Amino acid sequence: MQPVLELKGISKSFPGVKALSGAALRVYPGKVMALVGENGAGKSTMMKVLTGIYTRDTGTVHYLGKEVIFSGPRSSQEAGIGIIHQELNLIPQLTIAENIFLGREFVNKFGAIDWRKMYQEADRLLKKLNLSYSSHRLVAELSIGDQQMVEIAKVLSFKSKVIIMDEPTDALTDTETESLFRVIYELKSQRCGIVYISHRLREIFEICDDVTVFRDGQFIGEKSVKELKEETLIEMMVGRKLEDQYPRLNLPRGKKRLEVKQISGPGVTNASFSLYSGEILGISGLMGAGRTELMKIIYGALPKTQGQITLDGTPIVIRNPQDGLACGIVYISEDRKRDGLVLGMSIKDNMSLTALRYFSNRLGGLNHKEEQNAVSDFIKLFSIKTPSMGQVIGLLSGGNQQKVAIARGLMTRPKVLILDEPTRGVDVGAKKEIYQLINQFKKEGLSIILVSSEMPEVIGMSDRILVMCEGQISGEFFAEQATQEILMAAAVGKQYGAIQE
């Protein structure tokens, strides 16, 4: 089969950095090509070279059998190569149709906008994607998943032959992800070639036909998904074996640190559990099971309607996150961009934001030297890749942003660290580094709650595992007992005997 798009021998250098060296990518009609690699592997640079944002130093781009040079995103878009970015580019106050045809409105013979034709064409595009809602709806009324469908319709309005999806499920629920996959199958049936950029290996094995792997700006290989195992793909991405991807430490646990008795609140009913010093307690369950809600109740971000929380044997009252921090409970959000980090601020300011009281002098001012020393120590300890602590955090990779978020929590010297989806959107190499940091905290006696949708991660890192279903704890297991089948059964409400304390 001839590729609809082929990039060969692509090289691109910036001052002091070789971003791409002999990189290659082929996209076939009616097939999904995954493009994978660690953060910094060159995936984004390759897409910018393809669409003309960057000029390539060497190499060729062939599209529909002809060599092409695009002058920028508009020329590649008009040629039929569309990109759906991780950050959606829609105007909430406009309708779906207005967003799809913004700057390309249909005009009648009198020079006025032909609204009827525009809405008819927008409705036709939505129908092509098997979407039932009207193009008269405002984008602001749509979920993130539906907004992404509008982006796909917008790309199709250019009669795109190739569609590039950059981390398309990053902000989607499980249901929205299923809807996206249905649309991808529909696009395949229409002979569209799709480039699927993702860190989520499970999705790659579910939706993609072939995989292209980049490492350090170089093309490592192209394989059929059917020929690959997950371990082999990870080895190709990181250049080393990852047999010890989950380096769990088997250490004796300490004294009881936290006890939660009959807690209820938004999305949670009668939850009870204990947590010990030097222990990692995994929390598993399906989307909407109440895992995040339970953690936010404990931390004070959601109201508790009944129950008691005891810390080191003393009952505590937590009305808000400030109370939680004061008691020594830190919550690292699953959505670091919305709840965790201020992307326009520096690494230093983000890291020390909740711990400024530790750097204040007797006059109430800040001891900047102490603050800088502490931030510098954490940057070294966490191996955060940055030119300086003054770097704007929004420019860091997802893995390095997550390390800063965790470091900020540790700066407050907590007793309990709650990590909600700590490796979401993080590449496999950075995941391993985060696991090693979690083990270091465990060695030091910190009590850790690890909330994760990735069952291998929960089983691989936890000492004990709680499973939630419909707001209740439906199972409790030692890690040695746990399998993905057992956890899934508990997650859908099938009863397994909980372990005894």
UniProtKB/Swiss-Prot annotation:
It is a peripheral membrane protein. The keyword Transmembrane helix does not apply. The keyword Repeat applies. Pfam families: ABC_tran (PF00005). One of its GO terms (molecular function) is ABC-type D-ribose transporter activity. CDD domains: ABC_Carb_Monos_I, ABC_Carb_Monos_II. Its EC number is 7.5.2.7. It is found in: Cell inner membrane. Its main location: membrane. Part of the ABC transporter complex RbsABC involved in ribose import. Responsible for energy coupling to the transport system. Residues 5-241, 249-495 form the ABC transporter domain. It catalyses: D-ribose(out) + ATP + H2O = D-ribose(in) + ADP + phosphate + H(+). The gene is rbsA. ATP binds at residues 37-44. This is Ribose import ATP-binding protein RbsA. It comes from Photorhabdus laumondii subsp. laumondii (strain DSM 15139 / CIP 105565 / TT01). The lineage of its organism: Bacteria, Pseudomonadati, Pseudomonadota, Gammaproteobacteria, Enterobacterales. Belongs to the ABC transporter superfamily. Ribose importer (TC 3.A.1.2.1) family. The complex is composed of an ATP-binding protein (RbsA), two transmembrane proteins (RbsC) and a solute-binding protein (RbsB). Keywords: ATP-binding, Cell inner membrane, Cell membrane, Membrane, Nucleotide-binding, Repeat, Sugar transport, Translocase, Transport. GO terms for cellular component: plasma membrane.
